Amino acid sequence: MVNNVYDLVTRTMEQEFPGRVAFRWVEDATGTVKEKTYAEYAQDIRRAAAWFARNIPEVEGKRVVLLSRNCYEYGVNTFGAVLAGAVLVTMNQKKAWDELSWELELAEPALILNDGVDYGCRDQLEAAYGERLRPMDVWKDTAPGGLEKKIDPNALMVMLFTSGTTGRSKAVMLAERNFFTVMQMHVAMGDHLLDFKHRQLPEDKNDVLSNFAILPLFHLGTFICLFSWPFKGWALNLCSDLRNFYRDLGLMHSDSIAVAPVLMESIYKDVKRGRADKLNGLWNPCGSSAMFDSELLLGLVENGMYITQCYGMTETCGDGLVNYAQAEPHIRALGKPDGHCEYKLDETGEICIRGGCVMLGYYKDPEATAEIIDKDGWLHTGDLAREDEDGYYYMVGRKKNLIILGTGENVSPEELERRLNACPEVQECVVKEMGKKIGALICCAEEKQAEVRAFITGLNRTLPLYQRITAVEFSAEPLPRNAMGKLLRR
């Protein structure tokens, strides 16, 4: 199996699948679908690599930052930059200037490639970085150049910022070996998809699938697809704006999609209301394990869909647990170890992972690195779980979210949130410590607040004294989430 970027481009793209479609997207100006084959993609990667090598002095190890919505050039710049010897850095272009400027100062970019859209801090970007700010297709008029196999598999190649829910993001340092260790899991997932497809449609001999990429490419969950989908010569159908979800999906048939909770719920409603035709043949929603209600997942399965769930972190390059279960009770699980790294539950029940998937560390933060990776190389995920007799792991809660009371008891906010969400009037909620009390921030309609309070009163009667919710705040507006749809706790 290919185990490096150079071979992925020169062997897989240029020799194995040159004529297959690598990318599709809808051109907004015309509403038509544009395509790039793997041969065209590889030529543009060669253009980009040549441009970076010529225009970034002493390019080796220099930072190239991408600030852009999902687009074809994102993939070109990713491989072009690292093949030239630079370090590729992805960032959330929609962050407020306070956060974005902090991340940029940490990364010290030699070059910032952007899509030209003003996300609210264009003036500050231009004032701070001037000539270092260039368009995503800056290389378009450059002749394709030669490529060298020179990436050190154990050296820093890519930096991605964590989508934190409790504080500042950290810059995760990943090497080439991290990505290609994880490819073993992704290739196996692809085999599972083909097996399901051929069992459902035995007359369909087509082994080429396509993935609808709606989640942002700056996040590992989508970014990893730039590496994994070329392995089988499959296509990424890019969507850059959630508002165009149904338009783009209708124009580009897609088999698979990685989804956040809000989008999974939308797909579920379409299926349950007899509007599956809006999904244009989509049959494989893939999401982060334990983020979805099992009733929702089972409803999709009953209507012919195949659910895949993955548990991982940016710090493990997305590697971790995989769940192919399509029925209770295992559909609620995080999944099983994928078999390509080592996994264990420590004495506290925390999931720990060791192997080629584990990051190099947090950039310029050795203290935080030492807190998460122990002296024996085990990465401590911060997630608490239990294992059943079939080898499935089930989420218990986040270690850092535990509310530790003055009496010594530990309270899992996730468990209380699950119970609160059983109230029909609760749209969403976050349980956290509020002034030494267990508190709940609840989104619901103003006229429903009394009913929610009554529900909490009844719930408290069923809970031990130390678990009872004694502080409640309401919001008529949706609670804040990060870029991947996770509720913020800060």
Give the positions of each predicted feature.
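Conserved AMP-binding/adenylate-forming
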Residues: K36, A49-K95, I214
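AMP-binding/adenylate-forming catalytic core of the ANL superfamily
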Residues: I112, G355, L360-G361, L384-Q467, ...
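Gly/Ser/Thr-rich phosphate-binding loop
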Residues: D255-V259, I267-P329, E342, Q427
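Conserved ATP/PPi-binding loop(s) of AMP-dependent carboxylate-activating enzymes
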Residues: K336-G339, D346-I372, Y392, T407-V411
